[in-house]
Amino acid sequence: MIVNAWRVRATAEESELPPDGVPFDARLLTEGRAEWLREVGLEPGTPFLISPVLEYDVVLNRFFQSPGMRMKAVNTQFGYARDLAAFLTFLWSARCRKGWRDAGEEDHLAYLAWRRRDAAGPRIAGATWNREVAGVDAFYRWAVRVGHVPTSPVPQIALRPRVGPHLARRTADEQRPATYARDAGGERVAWLPPMEYRVWRDVGVRGYDAAGMPRAGFRGRWAARNATFCDLMVRTGLRLAEQCALTVFEVPWWTSDLGSYTRFWLPKAVAKGGSARWTYVPGSVLGDVDDYRRWDRAEVVADAQAAGRYARWRHPWVVEDPIRPWARRVGSTFRVAVENLALRERRLLLVDTPAGLEPAMLWLGESGQPLSMSAWKEMFAASNRRCRAAGVLLACHAHMLRHTFAVVTLEQLQRGHLAALAEQHPRQREHYTRVFGDPLDWVRRRLGHRSVVTTLVYLHVLAELEMETRMALVPGGWDLPADVIDETVAAA
């Protein structure tokens, strides 16, 4: 069998048993798989590539087991795998079925022309191209270093020497791909003003008509859950992967004494780049999350428990005492704090409650199983289709909600910041700025950016708008954690 593309797959801890008609010696290959993976040092969830002729290249796939790759986040590993697979597919389909060992500089340049300039190609943006080149370059740097190929097909140029007494000197052999795009970083930041977000949510997610009224023919069983998911994302700035990884232990129940805002800790194990941080949630949104937990979530959990679905989970992690979130893998004697579990492990995490076992993951589907990122992406796609069908010219994706949070929050924080400074004399302003910091840095910390330079893109978005337009697009009704901020300043 021959297909036309390299494919990305994930290493599974267990394989399904072949049919009974398969010879017994073949069935042996599926037994003791978990132990074998540990012996050879393969982590479940590690990506690997399958060739168009369905071959597993042992040498090529060692790249994903190298120290540099194993230290990266799982999503980053799969990003590298997809970008490498795309280049290898190009070699196969457009370069006479050339193998990765035979690729030369001319193949990389042909790939550049097709990806960015060819009228029949995808014409990708500079930032996307740079990401793809980085993945392919990392693979070939590894292949050259360990001796699998003599040279890399990605042409290199020497980095310019740094200047300044406090900057580390670069060595002469430090290089970077010569084909990096110079137009990266100029892409427009897509965001929705609060009013447009509500229209998109009501029409696309809740199934309302264009006039904002409930539509009789809409059968959205999970409209309330999906709308709550979107509201939480647009009001916290969490990434899709981060919000998908939340458990019932991270998100608190709302109580009246929490005030208009409360916060929870996003642990390092699920925060991108290890950017653990406090996440602020409006009380209104947290109340909607509570309603989902009490009704929709509780119903599917009860149905799954009655059907015995959780008892059939293979090798789950179990929290034996919900008051103390420590988990133990079935068959293991070691306990691990839930906050240290990655997304893959959290999807196998059960909580032993008086009613029986139930998943620790916050967001569950109709079968009572944790929802995947792909399921949420399809929810956004379906919502956009409903908007088009209703004649509403709005579309949204998960990261666009993160952009919306950043732009709206930065604009409102700037207004409050300037108003506070205007009422103070110079020494008070200095003290206020030292304690509170500036709005841009506050947004940076909420987004989990390492550098404020990354967050500056949202300041540039606001700089492009006239003040009257900013006041119209970002009304004052979008409440902020002002009381929390004031308490922080007062305590300091």
Where in the sequence are the language-model features?
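Long, amphipathic, Lys/Arg-enriched alpha-helical "connector/arm" segment
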Residues: 168-222, 265, 271-273, 284-287, ...
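Short functional hotspots where side chains directly engage DNA or cofactors
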Residues: 256-259, 265-268, 397, 421-462, ...
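Short, charged phosphate-coordinating catalytic segments
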Residues: 146-150, 233-259
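N-terminal core-binding DNA-recognition domain of tyrosine recombinases/integrases
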Residues: 60-76, 84-171, 207-210, 214-217
